[in-house]
Amino acid sequence: MSFEQIKKVSVVIPIYNEEESLPLLLERTLAACKQLTQEYELILVDDGSSDKSAEILIQAAEQPENHIIAILLNRNYGQHSAIMAGFNQVNGDLIITLDADLQNPPEEIPRLVKTAEQGYDVVGTRRANRQDSLFRKTASKIINAMITKATGRSMGDYGCMLRAYRRHIVEAMLQCHERSTFIPILANTFARKTIEIDVAHAEREFGDSKYSFMKLINLMYDLLTCLTTAPLRLLSVVGSVIAVSGFLLAVLLMVLRLIFGAIWAAEGVFTLFALLFIFIGAQFVAMGLLGEYIGRIYNDVRARPRYFIQKVVGDNKTNDNQEEY
């Protein structure tokens, strides 16, 4: 497959309560883009920030000839929905995503462009010498292993959002309308040729991570139910094993009752209660997992917008109240 020459690069950055890091982010990202031989644009998506992030973005986008487009969402929809909103506005042949916390340096952008020029659909990244807590590193390894098992695509660091996508990959992703989206996995679904390179990783200088413990748990549920139906098959297997085990246990208890009498059966009542609680617990876990799938089906059937764009500023245009799916 031959690839068209990269004439323009679009950088999409989701923003959520990053007013402290925004001035430095804009300065470093624009400086990195100026090193490119291609044209470029910087698309910043405010994901319903409650601080002054939106005001800073508007001021930056209103400056003449600064290649910045600011997209304001009416509320917080989540990182990946915000990126999809940015994808809808891109004009580049290569689209790069970047987090706003500056843990992945914008200075890596030219290297991603050079790598993509070698003919790759997707350029992924691995965080070298990762500057995160042991908990976050462990959680990331578990999630990456789960994704690799479910997708069959071996990539070392799905959690790093510093990535480059060819335009046809982005257009394919925009055709997908599921409510829950994990962009790196979705992109690899359509990619024919991918690569992963090591990039620098720094400690977070401003604010705290937007992924709390509960959000990481929700992310794992999202990935589990978005990627595969294997858990449903596993439930069938586990249910069958429990049913057979219960039948065999019932036979065993009847035999023991015949041999040792009713006194033995009374003495084993607590064991029966323990087994009963185990089976009830397994049923509730299964019901919860089924509920996750049913809930996602319900959300998809309602077909509500994935996000709602309140305003677009920059690139010689200002639009209000644009609804996007």
Swiss-Prot record:
Membrane spanning residue stretches: 235-255, 269-291
Gene3D superfamilies: Spore Coat Polysaccharide Biosynthesis Protein SpsA, Chain A
Any single GO CC term annotated in Swiss-Prot or TrEMBL for this entry: plasma membrane
Alphabetically ordered keywords of this record: Antibiotic resistance, Cell inner membrane, Cell membrane, Glycosyltransferase, Lipid A biosynthesis, Lipid biosynthesis, Lipid metabolism, Lipopolysaccharide biosynthesis, Membrane, Transferase, Transmembrane, Transmembrane helix
Keyword Transmembrane: yes
Compartments in which it is found: Cell inner membrane
InterPro entries given in the database record: ArnC_tfrase, Glyco_trans_2-like, Glycosyltransferase_2, Nucleotide-diphossugar_trans
GO molecular function: phosphotransferase activity, for other substituted phosphate groups; undecaprenyl-phosphate 4-deoxy-4-formamido-L-arabinose transferase activity
This protein's name: Undecaprenyl-phosphate 4-deoxy-4-formamido-L-arabinose transferase
Gene label: arnC
